[in-house]
């Protein structure tokens, strides 16, 4: 396992260890699925290590590490690459093997990957199937461990909702230091520049990007990633709360650490399909 380590200051009486995973992209399909889906599985796995067995061995390694080092696994989405009978079964089975808290990604809802506009109507075609397989509520959820509050949101389509904001406000009433989990990272200038200048990406694939970035995107990507008012309201509130100590995200397939505000770090996990993981020591 390619392991990196970060420390988050939260003022806990005892340290809490999290093993942060993201973007595994399992690509299973079987005879219960149509031929198109089976062909998709064979095609997509080539991008993600070339073998589902290899991906599962990476997950086995992470579970063994978490058990050995008393870690709660936190996974920030895209455990599976698309919806299939076997992928959903694998999602359920994998999260049952170790104590896990989950923030859903956009690929958990993908029917054929890129074949349609990803919006709420598209998501709802598979939402209940994904929810049935997941270890916790996927729209928003919380988990308290060792005096720390973990709060997860579904922002896989680059949006937050008023319901997300209401949920966060209620969770902060607990008065506990809080870490936010989400699939899509919140925009920072450093991360956006890295995506453009180092990764040579045509857009930043971030949540809450401002207009001076969006104006350079293609029409499709600009529409996809332009934040609506509930998204802006959520980010403004969440990033200015003293109890919110860090953001954990995924989506980009490489590790990146930056500050959203002078006091709020964001840690983007590397790709699970590259056997990357982050040990998060919360103290």
Predicted feature descriptions by range:
Residues 61-72, 149, 158-258:
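His/acidic metal-ligating clusters that form di-metal
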Residues 26, 80-81, 108, 149, ...:
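Short active-site segment of divalent metal-dependent hydrolases/proteases
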Residues 6-10, 84-179, 202-206, 257-281:
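Extended active-site neighborhood of metal-dependent phosphoesterases/phosphodiesterases
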Residues 18-20, 75, 102-103, 180, ...:
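Residue-level marker for buried hydrophobic side chains located in beta-strands
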Residues 1-86:
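N-terminal active-site segment of His-dependent metallophosphoesterases
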Residues 48-55, 59-60, 103-113, 188, ...:
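A short, conserved beta-to-alpha structural element at the edge of catalytic cores
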Residues 23, 77-78, 105-106, 183, ...:
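Active-site glycine-centered loops adjacent to acidic/histidine catalytic or metal-binding residues
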Residues 12-38, 109, 181-205:
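Short, solvent-exposed beta-strand-terminating loops
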């Amino acid at each position: 396992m390619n392991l990196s380590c970060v420390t988050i200051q939260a003022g806990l009486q005892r340290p809490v260890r999290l093993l942060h995973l993201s973007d595994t992209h399992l690509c299973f399909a079987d005879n219960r699925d149509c031929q198109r889906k089976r062909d998709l599985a064979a095609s997509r796995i080539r991008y993600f290590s070339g073998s589902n067995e290899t991906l599962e061995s990476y997950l086995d390694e992470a579970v063994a590490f978490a058990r050995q080092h008393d870690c709660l696994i936190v996974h920030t989405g895209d455990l599976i690459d698309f919806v299939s009978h076997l992928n959903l079964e694998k999602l359920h089975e994998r999260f049952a093997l170790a104590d896990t808290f989950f923030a859903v990604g956009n690929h958990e809802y993908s029917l054929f990957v890129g074949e349609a506009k990803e919006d709420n109507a598209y998501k709802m075609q598979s939402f209940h199937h994904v929810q049935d397989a997941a270890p916790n509520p996927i729209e928003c959820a919380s988990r308290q461990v060792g005096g720390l509050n973990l709060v997860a949101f579904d922002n896989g389509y680059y949006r937050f909702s008023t319901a997300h904001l209401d949920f966060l406000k209620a969770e902060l009433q607990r008065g506990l230091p809080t870490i936010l989990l989400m699939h899509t990272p919140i925009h920072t200038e450093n991360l956006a520049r890295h995506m453009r200048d180092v990764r040579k990406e045509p857009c930043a694939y971030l949540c809450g990007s401002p207009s001076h970035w969006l104006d350079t995107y293609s029409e499709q990507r600009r529409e996809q990633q332009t934040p609506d008012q509930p998204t802006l309201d959520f980010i403004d509130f969440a990033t200015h709360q003293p109890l919110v100590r860090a953001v954990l995200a995924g989506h980009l397939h490489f590790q990146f650490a930056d500050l959203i505000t002078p006091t709020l770090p964001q840690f983007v996990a590397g790709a699970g399909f590259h056997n990357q993981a982050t040990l998060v020591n919360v103290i």
